[in-house]
Design a protein with these regions (language model features):
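Alpha-helical bundle segments that constitute or directly flank the non-heme di-iron/ferroxidase center
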Residues: 1-30, 91-115
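Alpha-helical scaffold segments that form or flank carboxylate-/histidine-based iron centers
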Residues: 4-12, 33-51, 89-96, 119-131
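A structural signal for well-ordered alpha-helices, especially hydrophobic packing surfaces
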Residues: 20, 50, 54-57, 78-81, ...
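Short, flexible helix-adjacent loops and helix caps
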Residues: 24, 28-31, 35, 58, ...
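Conserved alpha-helical segments that form or flank metal/cofactor-binding pockets of metalloenzymes
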Residues: 36-70, 139-143
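Short, highly charge-biased, low-complexity peptide segments
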Residues: 62-67, 116-123
Length: 143
């Protein structure tokens, strides 16, 4: 149980960090005020959930997991390339939607592989999936 709990929390922490990095990069590249406000709102939600998850990890004596360096570098480069093709709010929203979909798939997979994880960690992971689903829905108006 403890191993599944810790692994799930670490994935949630890393996922929140990756999402925050992407949102910062994309927010700088868009001048659409409504999209910028939506990104800021969800960045704040990710920061809040990350703090919750990180405190659960700390209570168990573990440090938060940083996103894998290669994955982080690839995501940043990929986002930069996609934005260079067409730097507008439509492209920015599409990139963020892709990120939401990836987060939903990744965290849902970890939830399914962690049936023995604590109820609190499963709750945090499910909250992250719901947040990504909501963000994805709200981004549709910008594509």
């Amino acid at each position: 149980m403890e191993n599944q709990t810790i692994a799930l929390l670490k994935e949630c922490s890393a996922g929140c960090r990756m999402a925050e990095e992407s949102m910062c990069q994309i927010r700088k590249a868009t001048d659409d005020q409504k999209l910028g406000a939506l990104i800021a709102e969800y960045k704040g939600k990710h920061e809040k959930l990350k703090a919750r998850v990180d405190s659960m990890l700390a209570a168990e004596g573990y440090a938060p997991k940083e996103p894998p360096m290669m994955a982080s570098a690839f995501a940043k480069a990929s986002t930069g390339v996609k934005l260079s093709w067409k730097e507008d709010s439509h492209q920015a929203a599409k990139i963020l939607m892709d990120g939401c979909s990836m987060g939903i798939k990744t965290i849902s997979s970890h939830i399914n592989q962690s049936p023995e994880a604590s109820a609190e960690s499963l709750g945090a992971a499910k909250d992250l999936v719901r947040m990504e689903e909501e963000f994805n829905r709200e981004l549709k108006r910008f594509v």
